[in-house]
Amino acid sequence: MAGVRHDDGSGLIAQRRPVRGEGATRSRGPSGPSNRNVSAADDPRRVALLAVHTSPLAQPGTGDAGGMNVYMLQSALHLARRGIEVEIFTRATASADPPVVRVAPGVLVRNVVAGPFEGLDKYDLPTQLCAFAAGVLRAEAVHEPGYYDIVHSHYWLSGQVGWLARDRWAVPLVHTAHTLAAVKNAALADGDGPEPPLRTVGEQQVVDEADRLIVNTDDEARQVISLHGADPARIDVVHPGVDLDVFRPGDRRAARAALGLPVDERVVAFVGRIQPLKAPDIVLRAAAKLPGVRIIVAGGPSGSGLASPDGLVRLADELGISARVTFLPPQSHTDLATLFRAADLVAVPSYSESFGLVAVEAQACGTPVVAAAVGGLPVAVRDGITGTLVSGHEVGQWADAIDHLLRLCAGPRGRVMSRAAARHAATFSWENTTDALLASYRRAIGEYNAERQRRGGEVISDLVAVGKPRHWTPRRGVGA
């Protein structure tokens, strides 16, 4: 793990080795930070957050909704509690969607009409980026210039719109990719198709254009550098958070009673979207080798999983384990916490995972996790301390790992691991995440303003005079 650069508020940035598994960090990338002193004076008053393909109000575990949706909503709520307004732009997906939803004081969601409400696949959304961008720009145009201080785009589709908004509004663009096409394509599950070249091109453009890039882990920082040639000095590592008021240890007996589960049954939970990428089939196939183990699957079909929405149910029947597999729909946070407390362990066998929020939420409830050693999961789970990491997706290996962890959980070691899991998860608070987000925003605003001052406004003034956008600065690899 790379060293974490830490600004202690004095303007001097010291480097230290990170504590393994600590919460949100303020890494500036492998090349180190700039020497500029960024302060609270660069805090934004209002953030325009862009989420083209999925609403932060969508139920995680359905459609394309998952950890990214939780991240957007929770970070917006916590920024608002610090006096920073957040306006979230997302595509309307139903005629009943109101134009504006006031979620909480300081947080509102703008549902932008762009294309048909239903039946539009995520891979068709690039055809509606112009319509979405028009809706975003029109919303800003009713205000005086300078209404938004910064744009934060989530996922590459939003980055395409954010790039335009940045140029039009003359404010910095911060971008969070959440996933990268090249990473997903390198670890495809059976039944999954590769991400299209269009996405790879679009991601490269956004990486080149963004003023700052936010990634979930140091590993993701290395990926965006190696795959897209990102400038390390423009990267900030910000770990997602967990709601520690909801996800906390509790009474397992009470949780099992609420779900109608026997107290002495061995229970493994899988929570997530039902699609090959998340690999729920691995859990079922492993369970077939472990008599007496009950599997609870909570989530709905998504992505390529929509082609066979009942595929997992049929697989359980084919494996002869239907009687000990319980399928639940996507759960609210409160019900999800109950499920985590009821389980002996939670399985996260994904082929690709930029972080793995479910793993941290489960550990916050004191439940150990068995997870694939991919992406951000080695950060989310401390191997041998709060759970077990499995290399690869061989079913026998997963069955052995689950069986071993279940045996540990049944003895004194299980109590030690449960306490360690809760302590580890506590380092991933949304307060820590918000601190790191604000640090990134300050850098973006401070560096952006410093660059404008350095140029003396001459280039911008000249461009405005000839009818160009208020801000236009081509980056490497992006033509005029």
Swiss-Prot record:
Record has Iron as a keyword: no
Disrupted gene: phenotype observed: Increased intracellular levels of ergothioneine, 8-fold increase in reactive oxygen species-producing cells, decreased resistance to the antibiotics rifampicin, isoniazid, bedaquiline and clofazimine. Increased oxygen consumption and extracellular acidification rates, which are further increased by membrane uncoupler CCCP, indicative of electron chain dysfunction in the absence of MSH. Absence leads to alteration of transcript levels for 139 genes which probably compensate for loss of redox control. Loss of induction of some pH-inducible genes at pH 4.5, including the redox-sensor whiB3.
Binding-site residues, 1D-myo-inositol 3-phosphate: 53, 64-69, 122, 155, 179, 199
A Gene Ontology term for the protein's cellular component: cytosol
Positions of UDP-N-acetyl-alpha-D-glucosamine binding: 59-60, 67, 273, 278, 331, 353, 361
Record flagged with keyword Glycosyltransferase: yes
A single MF term (Gene Ontology): magnesium ion binding
Coiled-coil residue windows: none
BP terms from Gene Ontology: mycothiol biosynthetic process
Protein EC: 2.4.1.250
SUPFAM superfamilies named among the record's database cross-references: UDP-Glycosyltransferase/glycogen phosphorylase
Subunit structure: Homodimer.
Purpose: Catalyzes the transfer of an N-acetyl-glucosamine moiety to 1D-myo-inositol 3-phosphate to produce 1D-myo-inositol 2-acetamido-2-deoxy-glucopyranoside 3-phosphate in the mycothiol (MSH) biosynthesis pathway. MSH and WhiB3 are probably part of a regulatory circuit that mediates gene expression upon acid stress (like that found in host macrophage phagosomes).
NCBIfam families assigned: mycothiol_MshA
Protein name: D-inositol 3-phosphate glycosyltransferase
Gene that produces this protein: mshA
